[in-house]
Amino acid sequence: MTSEHGAEAALAAAAMTLRPNLKVLIGGSFGVALISALFLPWPLALASTTLGAFMLAGADIDARTFLLPDLMTAGALLSGLVAAATFDPVSAWFGVATATARAAGTALVLGGVRAGYARLRGREGLGLGDIKLAAALGAWLPVEAIPLCFALATAAALITVLLATLRGQRIERTTRVPLGAFLCPAVWLTYFGSALVG
């Protein structure tokens, strides 16, 4: 009985860990909603706020746990497909089809990077959650904006590592870096910028 209670407690603790910090989520979502409402027409502002909420949750959880919950990545992917169907100038079906193709292509590319790194280094560098996040960003972003999104995330990660090194923190080749914590904000920034100019 004790072991059963211990297992239940461990599962409950894990579930709590994979929940976003409500202060971060609510406060951040309010900020995203305000910025979106100020600069975008209301349908795009609603889409931007939805994406921002998912990305805030993902960044917060990944920064603490190095995990991206399926609920977050799947929700971001599905809402991206809904947005594609809503805003595509040709038709809803065409929007969903092109968004699905972008999602699959982006996930396949990052999956290839993951497999290549594992073969080369003998250990995993990217988690499956990162691949699912790549699919979600592919659904949301125009294809020409996807490289910019990854560039922003990479630059932010490198700056963070550099600052940690300057503060005296020991950074090694095997030091884990939560990609989602940097990629999630980059996804929203790229989407917002794309919506703003286009």
What is the meaning of each model-derived region?
Residues M1-G198:
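A membrane-topology feature that recognizes alpha-helical transmembrane segments
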